[in-house]
Amino acid sequence: HDALPIFLYLPGGYPEFYLSELAAAERSRSSIAAYAAAGGRVLAECGGMMYLCRAIRDEEGKAYPMCGVLDQEATMEGMRLRLGYRKLRLGGREYRGHEFHYSSIVPQEVSEETVGEQLTARDEVAPTLLYRRGNVLAGYTHLYFAEQDPFALFS
């Protein structure tokens, strides 16, 4: 049996365009859920976070099962553009990035621990959260790693 990788990075994308295909990929979904449950380190940004949710709902409200690592749903219902530069303060470090999405998380506050502080470019509190469940970190912000080591997020 292959050893677990040291890190799984699920960047953004547009999972809402591939809901049927992602839902049908049961083996991939269960492998990712098992990896996370075994303590694997996962960083999921935007579409990657949506994929880790219990389900993604399309614009009409139809739910498609996803990985179920996070106990929440992403929804495209009532789409609204959210964007801007972000600063994430976590573990004594500051990370920079940006947020660009039309989906939302429901409910926003769930059983996962929310960590860090996210600010706008004007140092105002950003309305989105960074979720942590074990070694899984997931949020809407696409991080810029030229200034900080992504592995430091897990220390």
Regions found by a protein language model. Name each.
Residues 2-4:
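Short, small-residue-biased leader/transition segments that mark boundaries at the very start
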Residues 6-10, 51:
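Helical hairpin unit composed of two closely spaced alpha helices linked by a short loop
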Residues 8, 24, 154-155:
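Short, solvent-exposed amphipathic alpha-helical segments in soluble enzyme
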Residues 9-11, 43, 138-140:
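Structural motif
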Residues 15-87:
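Cysteine-nucleophile active-site neighborhood
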Residues 74-155:
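Amide-donor transfer/coupling interface in amidating biosynthetic enzymes
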